[in-house]
Swiss-Prot record:
The keyword Iron applies. It comes from Methylococcus capsulatus (strain ATCC 33009 / NCIMB 11132 / Bath). The lineage of its organism: Bacteria, Pseudomonadati, Pseudomonadota, Gammaproteobacteria, Methylococcales. Pfam families: Iron_traffic. Belongs to the Fe(2+)-trafficking protein family. The keyword Iron applies. Could be a mediator in iron transactions between iron acquisition and iron-requiring processes, such as synthesis and/or repair of Fe-S clusters in biosynthetic enzymes. GO terms for biological process: cellular response to oxidative stress. This is Probable Fe(2+)-trafficking protein. It comes from the Bacteria.
Length: 90
């Protein structure tokens, strides 16, 4: 049976993650308060941010930027898309 949580992002009861996404207090907070659906939404946005901003994830400044955006997306009011971003056509 899936673990159910009240998702901080979606504001609904939903399936929780199977394990913390990474070690430490931030990973534990996400594990306890973010649903699988919201985490998948974040991963899609993170990929877009990496591509649009041409980030190199192993650089400290890029990791810090992604950490701030993740916090805003999951627990704050959301993030904005990069300036000039045009979504792909279906």
């Amino acid at each position: 049976m899936a673990r159910r949580i009240i998702c901080a992002k979606l504001g609904i009861e939903a399936d929780g993650l199977d394990a913390p996404p990474f070690p430490g207090p931030q990973g534990q907070r996400i594990f306890e308060h973010v649903s699988k659906e919201a985490w998948q939404d974040w991963l899609k946005l993170q990929t877009m941010l990496i591509n649009e901003h041409r980030l190199t994830p192993f650089e400290a400044s890029a990791r810090k930027f992604l950490e701030q955006e993740r916090e805003k997306f999951l627990f704050g009011g959301g993030t904005s898309t990069p300036q000039g971003y045009v979504p792909p056509r279906s």
